[in-house]
Amino acid sequence: MIFSTEFDILTLVILAGITISQSLFGVGILLWGTPIFLLLGETFVQTLTLLLPLSSMVSLLQILPRLGQIDKTIFLHFLKYSMLGIFVGLNVILIYRPDINLLVGIILFASVCLKIEILSKLIHRAVYKFDKLFIFIIGLIHGLSNLGGPLLVLRVSLEKFDKEIFRTTIASVYLLFAMVQLIILTFQIGYIEISITYFLFAAVIYFLQDFRDVV
């Protein structure tokens, strides 16, 4: 990994918005950041190297004070069954370098459709029957597009956790996803460049948002 201090004002503004979304709702940095930076002309690899360190850091900050509130059963399920999906999906992207803009658009549209009650109930029933396969598919979609978050939220929501366990468990799985993606990127590309400025900026925004909620 190579660390730099370069930054861009527009990028800082975008990162502020998506970091606030992540701190409030548990998703945002990858869900919104990925399509935004692709639309701005960044490659998928460049988008990953920008967003993954930030996502992992914010997830870590979310779970450190609440380690005891991570549901270990769910975390271990994702550790067992989603890693292969991420490995396959991300390696397909890195090796064949397809244009994923259409795929990202389809997944975002499908994420909106998850809000439809009838469709959501059908998916819930399918998940109960094919849970391991569903978790693998979440990993595969995340590896291909960086947008496994909505399905992750859907899967964890089936457990009817209270708010803190729900958010902390999602953050722990997001951290797991990001670490695996960064490892794959490092091995496939040889190095990735991480801007310390963006990294620290996201941390400041997270703490400011967290402080505002406390006050």
List where the protein language model places each region:
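Alpha-helical multi-pass membrane helix bundles of inner-membrane/thylakoid proteins
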Residues: L114-I138
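Short, well-ordered alpha-helical segments in soluble proteins
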Residues: A110-S120, L144, G148, K160
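Short, strongly hydrophobic alpha-helical membrane anchors
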Residues: M1-I9
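Membrane-interface helix termini and inter-helical loops of multi-pass transporters
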Residues: M1-I2, W32, L90-P98, L122-H124, ...
